[in-house]
Structure formats: structure tokens, C-alpha cells
Amino acid sequence: MDQSVLNRTLELIKPCPGLLNHVQEVAKLATHVSGTLGLNEKTLKMAALVHDVGKYSWPQELHSKYPLYTRDLQIVRTHPLVGEKILCEFWPEIPKTIRQLVRWHHERPGGLGYPDQLHNPPIEVLVLAACDVYSAITSDRPYRPGVLAVDQALIEVAKFAPPQVVAALADAISKQCVNY
């Protein structure tokens, strides 16, 4: 990824409360987990750093609003597609894998995710999703404190991620890739 593309993307998300820290934490975790599983660390790291760029399009108040109502959830669920579009504009030669990871980071096995309801998301998608969910659960948000219990957060991740991903994530956490 061209450094200027990464810089432009990170500049977009800076005004979003906590988002820059979140994507940096997800990138650290995803790099460790992908390395443990023999996946492409560079690809997962790049995708993690830009996976939430679509949140840039949200109304500012949505970043700290709770609870979210039906209309709010409709907006929230657009961010993978908006992020993919932004990246394609910034980076016309974006690798297909990174584009797909950004688009699919909320996909879950059995067609339970969005935006495409994939039944069998690729392992890379589940790695990014697991790291994203872990970071989201354990981080403080304007409307709630983060969960402090690592085990509690990993139980949530295990609801959709394969055991090898959960184990690699637990290893990353134990090696203090992130604060816990």
C-alpha cells in the first residue's frame, strides 16, 4: 500500500472518537494472528488499518450514540461498502484481497453477517473480524466502558471464529500485543 493512501485514509478517521486507536490495535492483533496461522501478515495489517474507513461517512453523533435505532443500524451497516468505495477511489490498484477484507469484515459463518451474507467467509476475513470484535469489546466507548475480562471477550469471538483463530488471538493477547 502506498504510504500516501494509508495517510489519507487515517486522516479521514482521526475525527471519529477512538477509531484511530481501534484500527491500530486491530492491526497489531491481526498481524500476530495471521503470522501464527501462516497467513499474509502484511495484507492483514493493511486491511486492519483501513477496515473502518467507511465510518468516516457517519453523522458525527452516531459515533457516540446509544442505543442505536433501526435507522442508525442501517447507516452503521453501510460502512464496509462505503469503506470499499473510498479505498477504490484513493487506491485504484487496490489488491482484491484487501478490498474484500474491508468489505467483508462483518461477515459471519452461516450467512449471519453483512453486507453479503457469506456462508463461508475466508479465514482471513474471520481473523480480521475476530481482532475487530475483540478490540471493540475491550475498548472504552463514549456510551460504555470496555469489558476488562479477556476470557469474556474471547467467548464472544468464539461464537463465530474457528478455534485456531481464537487460540492465535489469545496468544497475541498473552504476548501483550495490546493492552488488557
Each model region followed by its residue ranges:
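Histidine- and acidic-residue-rich, metal-dependent catalytic cores
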Residues: D2-Y180
